[in-house]
Every structure is written in C-alpha cells, then in structure tokens.
Amino acid sequence: MLARHHLRARNQGPVRQTVTETIMVEKGAMVTCGEKLVQLLESHGVDTVFGIPGNHTVELYRGLAGSGLRHVSPRHEQGAGFMADGYARATGRPGVCFLISGPGLTNALTPMMQALADSVPMLVISAVAARHQLGMGEGHLHELPDQRALASQCSRFSHTLMRADELPKVLARAFAVFDSERPGPVHIEIPLDVITSDASHLEIELWPSVAPPGPAIAAADEAAAMLTAASRPVMVIGGGAVSAADEVLQIAERLDMPVVNTVNAKGTLPPGHALAVGSSPSIGAVRQILLDADLVLALGTEFGETDFDMLFAGDLVLSCPLIRVDIDARQLCRNQRPTLAIHADSGEFLRRLLPLLGPAATNDGPARVRAVRAALPDEAHYHSQFQDFFELLQAALPGLVLVGDSTLPTYYAVWQYEASAPRRYFHSATGGGTLGYAIPAALGAKLALPDSPVVALIGDGSAQFTFAELAAGAAAGVAIAVIIWNNAGYSEIEQGMLAAGITPVGVDIAAPDFVEAAIALGCAAARATTPESLRRALLDSQSRHVPTVIEVMQTDFISLPAGGWYRD
C-alpha cells in the first residue's frame, strides 16, 4: 500500500474560510467534488470527522483546513468508526468517517456492524476505484471486487456516487435516514475520477429535512383506550425512545406506569424516580413485573436477546396485550407479537397520545417499582461489590458518561448501573458485541461533550484491540479516564469453557505493562488497588489534557463464585 499523507486539519473558524474563498476567486480555481462534500457536510451541521488520509481521499482534505470541521486522526480505521459511534451516541447526531478505499473501509466494517445493531447514526464516506475500473478486477490499488456490496451488509444503504451533480441529493438521502427512519450507518463511496471532478457549479442549498412518521389517528385513539382501561400497565423503552425522554416521563406519570428500560435507554427517566424500574428485563424481578402486567406499551425496542434474555433463561413471552411502537415497521413483526402495532416515531406517538388520555390514573406504579427494587439484591446475578464500584464512579465524577466494552463489569452494569441522563451510558456488549470499542468510543464521546467527564471501562483483553487509539487521544488533547479491568486474559470465556467441560485454550493471553505503555503513548497512567486510590485517580484525570489510564486488578475489588458470571 502506498504511504498515507498525514494531514492535520486546523479549525480556525469563519475567518479562515473567508480567506480561502477569496483566494479561490482570485485564482479562478475549480472546486472539486471532494471540497464540495466538505462544504455540504458543514451545512448539514457536521462539525467533526474521523479518518486517516490516504492517496485516494486527498481531495476530501483539500477543503478541510479552510472549513469549520475538526478532523481527528485515529491510529486505525476501526478507531475512526468507534470514535464516530461514541460521538453519535453522546449527541444523537451522525458521526462521520473519511476512509480510503479497500483496507480503509474493511477496517471500519466492525464499527459499522456495531452501529447497525444498535441503531447509531454514522456517515461513512470512502473512495473507490475510478468508474471505468469498477468491477474490472485489474489489480488497481485497494481494489475490491464489489466494495459497495460489502458495505451494504453493515449499513442502512450504500451508494456509489457516479456524478458530482448527485452529491446534494445523496447526502439528503443519508440525513433523511438519520432524521426520519431507524438510524444506522450510511455508506457513500466516491470513484476517484468523480471525487476530483469539477463541482464548482453546485449550490450549497440543502434539500428539505424529512420529519419522522407520526401515528395514524385511529391507532393513537385505540392505544389511548387500551391504556386508559389497564390497571397494571408497564412501559418498556428502548433506544428508539431516548430522544423522547420528556414525553416518556409525562405519559408514565399520567398513567402511573412503571418504566422498564433497555441498555440503550438507560437514564431516560431520572435515576431514583418512583416509576423507574431500572435494572434489566433479563433479570427475574424485572421480568416478573412484565409478566404481571395487564398491558405493556413498548417504545423503540427490538426485544432483542442481549436486553431481554442475556442470562439465557429462555424467551420472555408476554401473555398480556402488547402495544408496540417503532419507527421501523419491520421491527413490529419480530420477536414479541403485538396486539396493536403502530408504525411511528416514539416521540411523535407520545405527543399524539398525551391529549387523548384522561386525568391522572392511579395504578400503584410506585409500589410495583418498589417491590422490584427490593427484590433485586436477592437476585442470583446481583453483586454488591459491583454496586459499590459503580457508586464510586458516579460519586467521584457526577454526571459522567460511562462507555463500556464487552467486559465483566459492563455485564453487571446492564442491571446494576443507573445513568444520570439519556446518552450517559452505552456499551458494545449488546447487538454486535465487539471488543475494543470502549477506548475510541469514549474519545468520540468526549470530543462531542467536552465539558462532561467521560470514562471508558474495558477489560485487559479488549484493551489490546484498540490501545493505540490512546495516542490519538493524547494528540487531540482529549481528557478521558480509561479503567482497564484486568482479570488476566479472557476470564469469562475461560469460565465458560470450564463450565462446559472444555480444557481452556487461547484464553490466557499475555498483557503489556499498561501503565508504561500508556505513558509511552503520551498519556498519564496509574494503578488503583483500593476504592480510595481509584477515586483519587478519577479525580486527577479531570485536571489533565490527555487520557488517563487506570489499571484495576479484578481481585482487588470483587470476588466471584466459580463457574462464570452468567452461571447460577
């Protein structure tokens, strides 16, 4: 592969842009399609892009230095994708990647898969071979037989831009997905002869935005009647309801209705609210409140295994009437069968529903929630030491954004961690279930929310997937805390092998000295062996301008019974 050009974009605001435009007029230089793309992205409200420049994408970078877009250079395209994911989850706005063709795109497919599984808006812009070379198989640099077909498996749609004139409407299609459909990655590839073509004539005029769908009037009326008649209603909210937090609270309080959340909906109700069940529908006590309900209203959830059957207890089958609301009509026909299926955005539905309801109901909501919460400490998979650990994090850094990987503490966080607000907790253990997510995703979240403390929680095995991205964080001046939960290899997999009567193989991996490695990458680092030393390290991390790695040995903080976290 040819050497990549390492460019650093400097965001110097409108003044820099004005100077650049003046020079262009004086020289009479054309504006390439790559430059015009940057201008259009800025007009769409994009302020950050993640990518590694390469020979096939230099035209995207021609316009960056004079724009209002900040460019962040990861150390691997997988890091770019996970940074974009973290940025998007923290804000609700699409994270944007610039990728070279071939290996640049394939390196980002895992983040795209994770984002697709969790409905995270992401715009992936890549190069591709020139139009006359597409599908020829002649051995051109970075060539794939059908790059778009590969990307289409991990995106809402993948499009090859055949003419510069199509750029505004193709971008409009992408943002229509983000604004009005179930979000996820959108991939746009630009052939090399198109990205360099003249786009000077294209106006920076956005297409009208597309509003999300609202419910049919008859469906809203029927839902209101069913909810009004119920005496033990329960609401289940997924990631599709996060943007409707105010409406969720209003409806829950009007109907005196307990609210059960999935991982992606943590924090939608304020923690400690009398109607917030918290925990997880994978836990027995929470399942019971659903089974005891005489009506369930489900908003923006797929009823997927990693939220509703993480402990492999068997499928949850609701026997009561079920109202399902989803922005994706296909989801209404998956997993749980609804009594009433409503194709609508959750917020639009709740706003239509509220005036149809009568006066405040009395359905013993707080009492039912208290019963669930009282039962949680007796659950086989509840761990008091993890509860102490999570409470320490929140006390040290109030309002933190906690970004988890597929690692032991995040599994317990599914049912024991309560986020302070929407978009303040997310992890990769659901959906795609990838490793190496937390470090780059936390960097993306911090870039999106610079005034909020951000903590990555990752295992010693997972950390080795993307540890190099700490160098990108140090270069960008991103002050996150990274807790490396060290349990000496792939501990959960080892326990699973032992439980299945398999001699463990491939799980006892050697780890570097994480403290020294972090310092070598330009970060700060410490080891925490007690709750107080962890608290101090977290506080110290907030006064720096680089990531702080905090290594924690599992045995210093918790003890586990033999057999693995998911075994009784």
What residues fall within each predicted segment?
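Phosphate/pyrophosphate-binding active-site segments
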Residues: 25-28, 165, 203, 319-406, ...
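N-terminal alpha/beta PP-like core and its mobile active-site loop of ThDP/TPP-dependent enzymes
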Residues: 21-357, 479-482, 517-518
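Basic phosphate/pyrophosphate-binding loop/patch that engages nucleotide-derived ligands
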Residues: 180, 397-398, 474-479
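N-terminal amphipathic/basic-hydrophobic helices that include classical n-h-c signal peptides
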Residues: 1-25
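Active-site diphosphate/adenylate-binding microenvironment
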Residues: 34-37, 44, 52-55, 60-65, ...
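Conserved short loop/turn motifs at secondary-structure junctions
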Residues: 237-243, 378, 459-461
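Thiamine diphosphate
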Residues: 133, 137-142, 287-290, 333-335, ...
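Short hydrophobic beta-strand segments
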Residues: 48-49, 234-236, 401-405, 460
